[in-house]
Amino acid sequence: MANPVVTFEMENGDIMKAELYPEVAPNTVNNFVSLVKKGFYDGLIFHRVISGFMIQGGDPEGTGIGGPGYSIKGEFAQNGVANNLVHDAGVLSMARAMHPDSAGSQFFIMHKKAPHLDGAYAAFGKITEGMDVVNKIAETATDYSDRPLEKQIMKKVTVETFGEDYPEPETCLLYTSPSPRDA
């Protein structure tokens, strides 16, 4: 079975592709695939960009506090779920608030390796094409709150599931919106 591949088409025409790993974080992948299929990410921005660390997006409000109206269980070691995907450059992971089960739609893509996130955030995929685009976004000028001065807009986000079925995610009570300080 082929893993799902997500294509991020940026407003400027740049393309990033990421392979998702359902064997590592099955419900997280179900959630991401579901949101992509609904067009949730289309038109959203990378609202938080830290060169040498990561780029974060997926907030419908573009502020760092928005989400899809629900949260999912955090699939990472500190939350009792085995997840051995380390936060190397290009890895996709879910942003969350302090509560381990507070991730919803916000995600981040690693610009550089960050071992302090391993086991504490739900890594679920990796950029397979377009790491140069991640680098370009990560190196864009930002304001005092790490917000890009020039909007980094995901024009269209699509997923190829190769005929595999990815069910709707299991959701939790809605915890506080993700606004992590270290991821």
Labelled PLM ranges:
Residues 2-6:
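Short structural boundary motif marking the start of a folded domain
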Residues 141-150:
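Short proline/glycine-enriched turn/loop segments at secondary-structure junctions
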Residues 175-183:
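Single conserved hydrophobic/aromatic residue that forms the stacking wall/gate
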